[in-house]
């Protein structure tokens, strides 16, 4: 594995599905305050020309994580699982020597219905092994 050198930047990617960019003060909204996002953006590279062609949770997340269309990943609805053959942004950063973390909602491994009887000890949104798509840490 490659080692990330001391000059490699920290990378934080926010994946807010179903959030319109213009709903943030960063992009012109004046009725909402998001001071933490604003501070983070002020000291960051902000991508201003990105799009999700499928505004549904699981397909949008799969597209953002893999860079592939929903019809290619098989995520056309919310109740699907990610194939082990998919390469994600987590895999790519891990191969480059980064430690990777996923914090928040996953929603890419639910199957038809979450196993409600197993929550919260083994929630389906924190899968094991390859189903984590390259992310080391989960919260």
Give each language-model segment a name.
Residues 1-139:
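Formylglycine-dependent sulfatase
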């Amino acid at each position: 594995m490659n080692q990330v050198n001391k000059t490699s930047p920290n990378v934080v990617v926010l994946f807010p599905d179903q959030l319109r960019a213009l709903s943030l003060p960063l992009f012109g909204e004046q009725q909402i305050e998001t001071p933490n996002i604003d501070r983070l953006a002020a000291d960051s590279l902000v991508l201003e020309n990105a799009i999700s062609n499928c505004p549904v949770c699981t397909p949008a997340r799969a597209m953002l994580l893999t860079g592939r269309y929903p019809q290619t990943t098989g995520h056309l609805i919310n109740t699907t699982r990610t194939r082990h053959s998919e390469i994600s942004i987590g895999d790519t950063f891990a191969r480059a020597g980064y430690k990777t973390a996923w914090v928040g909602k996953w929603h890419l491994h639910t199957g038809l219905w979450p196993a409600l009887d197993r929550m919260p000890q083994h929630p389906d949104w924190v899968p094991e092994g390859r189903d984590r798509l390259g992310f080391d840490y989960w919260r």
